[in-house]
């Protein structure tokens, strides 16, 4: 049973490494969905277009960092993903909740006031070509401003989060043990 579990884990890790999206020759993060046969980025529901995921990817990186003896390939994968999160961090903005003109709960992304503290944010979806945050309604049309999608999808889906902060926190300890120059001999 132990051997079967190890084989299954190794296959899963191999799949994770194969699905890390390569953009302009550089590994990034993972897509929200991948085709089950080709492993390429894929659409899911109408509002879930093929995209890089600023949400699903953080759990993948946390899982990879939990491995007790990461291979050089896993180390490189983690390093590339952490770098992508750093480069695509959205600073100086916050989520503002409000009641819209219909009296319904709503939200918007607003620029922080000078000197105001805010957590960095990451979008749920980024374009595959150039890492632009985007949003989508049930019509399947990509929008670059969340206010352009309907209230139901805007408020019924998690479009921004700060979960990558967990990645950065764990990476601090992980990199001391396994970072780029620490894997010789593993």
Spans of features found by a protein language model:
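Short, surface-exposed glycine/acidic/tryptophan-bearing loops
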Residues: 29-36
